[in-house]
């Protein structure tokens, strides 16, 4: 039996009140709670994101749910510095 890493994604849940944040533990792992801005960062399995987003939006204390875009962002930065140098040189030539 081989161990496989479960792909996970974060959901940012904006709430009207933080009194019900304990209820969000049913849906995933609560990683962070912002008291000032009233949002909760919740980690869930990636295959359950759409189903849980629908369930969370129907809760009375939830304003909106935003899925994190981190899985779609390219995290390899090879050649980024070279690209920035060439773009700044072309911008300087235009002026």
From Swiss-Prot:
Keyword NAD (UniProt): no
The keyword Cytoplasm is assigned to this record: yes
Organism lineage: Bacteria, Bacillati, Bacillota, Bacilli, Lactobacillales
Stored InterPro entries: DUF2129 (IPR016979)
GO CC list: cytoplasm
A Pfam family hit: DUF2129
Homology family: Belongs to the UPF0298 family.
Record localization: Cytoplasm
Protein name as annotated: UPF0298 protein LVIS_1401
Keywords: Cytoplasm
């Amino acid at each position: 039996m081989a161990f496989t890493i479960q792909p996970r994604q974060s959901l940012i849940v904006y709430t009207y009140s933080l009194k019900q944040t304990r209820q969000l533990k049913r849906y995933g792992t609560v990683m962070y709670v912002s008291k000032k801005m009233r949002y909760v960062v919740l980690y869930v399995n990636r295959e359950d994101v759409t189903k849980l987003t629908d369930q969370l939006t129907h809760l009375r204390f939830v304003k909106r749910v935003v899925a994190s875009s981190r899985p779609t962002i390219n995290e390899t930065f090879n050649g980024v510095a070279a690209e920035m140098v060439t773009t700044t040189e072309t911008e300087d030539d235009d002026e």
